[in-house]
């Protein structure tokens, strides 16, 4: 089983959010590969983040690695600015895009909440992927 623990906090007027995945019990190789790919893709997206780069480039990094590994992302999930407001601009798509949502600078905080999926990235009526 793959368990994701997502922790949010509101402290002294600011929001924080973090997430970590854990393998619990017997996990098949496909599950282990998915967790490793998610970790690698998340770290590549973080490594891309530097002042002067467009926020939209994060989606390109994620999309390239997701495609290389045969996975998908859910196009209507996104990362976002975070601080005094939990979900704030800029909203960061997790797929290649040309949305002009600004250039990174020192100071603003960003929640890169990339989701990597084995499915085709479309949500079903019951919410499953």
Question: Language model features by range: what are they?
Answer:
Residues 1-129:
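Active-site neighborhoods and metal-handling regions in enzymes and metal-associated proteins
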């Amino acid at each position: 089983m793959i368990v994701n623990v997502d922790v949010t906090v509101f402290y002294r007027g600011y929001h924080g959010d973090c997430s970590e995945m854990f393998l619990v019990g017997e996990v098949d190789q496909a599950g282990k590969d998915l967790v490793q790919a998610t970790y690698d893709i998340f770290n590549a997206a973080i490594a891309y983040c530097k002042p002067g780069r467009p926020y939209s480039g994060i989606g390109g990094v994620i999309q390239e690695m997701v495609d290389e590994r045969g996975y998908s992302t859910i196009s209507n999930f996104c990362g976002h600015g975070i601080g005094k407001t939990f979900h704030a601009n800029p909203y960061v798509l997790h797929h290649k895009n040309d949305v002009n949502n600004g250039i990174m600078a020192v100071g603003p905080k960003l929640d890169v909440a990339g989701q990597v999926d084995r499915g085709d990235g479309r949500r079903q009526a019951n919410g499953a992927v």
